[in-house]
Amino acid sequence: MTKLRIKVVKKGNAYDLYGQDLPLQFKENRMTPECDQFELGQEFEVDNLDCPPGFCSWALADIQRDMSHIFFRGNYPWVAQKGATLVCCTDGFRPVFFKIERIED
């Protein structure tokens, strides 16, 4: 049975992306500098394309296309490791980067 492992490999923040000259200011008292939904190194395993428990539904919407591609035995020709890819959520202030790997029994 095919499964996917989704691992948090990087958490960004607005200052990493843009330096001190942010193109749009945010209210620091309303938002953490980095995403607080995930921890670096956190892993999720799924045997379908449903949202794993504890996974951000917004991030899932962003990476679901790549999850489907890898889950259904797709590969990307520019990625050396078959059955894997790197993706990120589209939060322009605090993106989270994920490694998706296919696990086959």
Regions found by a protein language model. Name each.
Residues V9-N13, L49-C51, I103-D105:
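Generic structural motif
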Residues C51-D62:
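Short, Lys/Arg- and Gly-enriched loop/turn segments at beta-strand edges
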Residues Q20-D50:
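Short, flexible N-terminal segments of the mature chain
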Residues K3-K7, E43-E45, F97-E104:
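Ser/Thr- (and often Asn-) enriched beta-sheet segments in non-cytosolic proteins
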Residues C35, C56, C88-C89:
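Disulfide-bonded cysteines in secreted/extracellular proteins and peptides
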Residues L60-D105:
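Short, compact, well-ordered microdomains
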Residues L4-Q25:
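Short, basic/aromatic beta-hairpin or loop at an interaction surface
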